[in-house]
Curated annotation (Swiss-Prot):
Similarity comment text for this entry: Belongs to the AdoMet synthase family.
Subunit note: Homotetramer; dimer of dimers.
Binding site for K(+): E43
InterPro entries: ADOMET_SYNTHASE_CS (IPR022631), S-AdoMet_synt_C (IPR022630), S-AdoMet_synt_central (IPR022629), S-AdoMet_synt_N (IPR022628), S-AdoMet_synthetase (IPR002133), S-AdoMet_synthetase_sfam (IPR022636)
Protein name per UniProt: S-adenosylmethionine synthase
Annotated keywords: ATP-binding, Cytoplasm, Magnesium, Metal-binding, Nucleotide-binding, One-carbon metabolism, Potassium, Transferase
Binding site for ATP: H15, D175, G176, K177, R241, F242, D250, R256, K257, A273, K277
Residues the record lists as binding Mg(2+): D17
GO terms for cellular component: cytoplasm
The protein's annotated pathway: Amino-acid biosynthesis; S-adenosyl-L-methionine biosynthesis; S-adenosyl-L-methionine from L-methionine: step 1/1
GO terms under biological process: one-carbon metabolic process; S-adenosylmethionine biosynthetic process
Species of the source: Desulfitobacterium hafniense (strain DSM 10664 / DCB-2)
Class of the enzyme per the UniProt entry, highest EC level: transferase
Length: 396
């Protein structure tokens, strides 16, 4: 039996980089609530006592960005100056411009439309907002069709915030990280080898109490007991102290947790971040579409694991390439799966936006604890509504 260990991490909503992701997406949502056709590329940076919001936004509506920033920080839990960062006293600076006219030219009217290659109906198609490649992944090793390590890391991080906000563990503070190492035998998860949790805390909380409480209230309620054994290792605040955290401890930036946002390193990544971007940016929308395709392929039973690569040219609606990789787990020929994908999914940016109904204020909720496998949310790219048709067309 081939054994191997695989590790993924997650972070809480109070992590500096995740604060930035949530602010960027909160601004996007606030704009989309008033102007669904807005173009938004919003970047955020945080450090001790300071938030800087910059980027390019083209819209016909007004949004109070400083108020949106402060409300987001308040909801995360930075509400006291003693935490080193406070929603009411931090400075908020903004530097916003409009989308480049050259980029808008390519997005507004796709290259195929300008060349007269599309029907009147298809002229509505939007050209890709940039070049690049995006990946989507799914596996049948969990009910969420996500790799087990990242699935558990997210659930632990979310639980860490829950016990803080509900005052079950009232000495916890917003910043925190989790990490899970899974042991695989013949590519199937069999046990948890290591769990790491680091959480910001009140200076008077002892290491012994933190360890005992986190095992009782976070680890054991989340991780299935059959995956734990006497050899499982637990590292709880392994430095021994985590009082200085959040933006006081580390500066944060939007888009710095792209592996946490996706598949925990189990799948490849094209390099583009999600938060703060409207769906004409294929970095976001095509990555969601690739997950949608991969999940439906696996849910249909066409493969046990599936990775989809999509690639685009700026201003061109049709993807320049679509690749299906099943890692030797396909039940039918991979080329046949590729044909089914092309026949059942519209992977032009306009097609993705329409299919997944992406011009809505749904993004802030995705900006912490992962964009995929979210059983706690009703996200359109997580639906398996194409699985039955794929299975029937595959003859299974």
């Amino acid at each position: 039996m081939a054994k191997k260990l695989f590790t993924s991490e997650s972070v809480t909503e109070g992590h500096p980089d995740k604060i930035c992701d949530q602010i960027s997406d909160a601004i996007l949502d606030a704009i989309f609530a008033k102007d669904p056709n807005a173009r938004v590329a919003c970047e955020t940076s945080v450090t001790t006592g300071l938030v800087l919001v910059s980027g390019e936004i083209t819209t016909n509506c007004y949004v109070d960005i400083p108020s949106t920033v402060r409300q987001t920080i308040r909801e995360i839990g930075y509400t006291r100056a003693k935490y080193g960062f406070d929603a009411d006293t931090c400075a908020v600076l903004t530097s916003i411009g409009e989308q480049s006219a050259d980029i808008a030219l390519g997005v507004d009217r796709a290259l195929e439309a300008k060349n007269g290659e599309m029907s009147e109906e298809e002229i509505e198609a939007i050209g890709a907002g940039d070049q690049g490649m995006m990946f989507g992944y799914a596996t049948n090793e969990t009910e969420s069709y996500m790799p087990l390590a990242i699935d558990l890391a997210h659930r632990l991080a979310r639980r860490l915030s829950e016990v803080r906000k509900s005052d079950i563990l009232d000495y916890l503070r917003p910043d925190g990280k989790t990490q899970v190492t899974v042991e695989y035998e013949d590519n199937r998860p069999v046990r948890i080898d290591t769990i790491v949790i680091s959480t910001q805390h009140h200076p008077e909380a002892t290491q012994e109490r933190i360890r005992r409480d986190l095992l009782e209230h976070v680890v054991f309620p989340v991780v299935p007991s059959e995956l734990l054994d006497e050899s499982t290792r637990y590292f709880i605040n392994p430095t021994g102290r985590f009082v200085i955290g959040g933006p006081q401890g580390d500066a944060g930036l939007t888009g710095r947790k792209i592996i946490v946002d996706t598949y925990g390193g189990m799948a490849r990544h094209g390099g583009g971040a999600f938060s703060g971007k409207d769906p004409t940016k294929v970095d976001r929308s095509a990555a969601y579409a690739a997950r949608y395709v991969a999940k439906n392929v696996v849910a249909a039973g066409l493969a046990e694991r599936c990775e989809i690569q999509l690639a685009y040219a700026i201003g061109v609606a049709q993807p320049v390439s679509v690749l299906v990789e099943t890692f030797g787990t396909a039940k039918i020929d991979e080329e046949k799966i590729g044909e089914l994908v092309k026949n059942n999914f519209d992977l032009r940016p306009a097609g993705i936006i329409k299919t997944l109904n992406l011009r809505r204020p749904i993004y802030r909720q995705t900006a912490a604890y992962g964009h995929f496998g979210r059983t706690d949310l009703d996200l359109p790219w997580e639906k398996t509504d194409k699985a039955a048709a794929l299975r029937e067309q595959a003859g299974l």
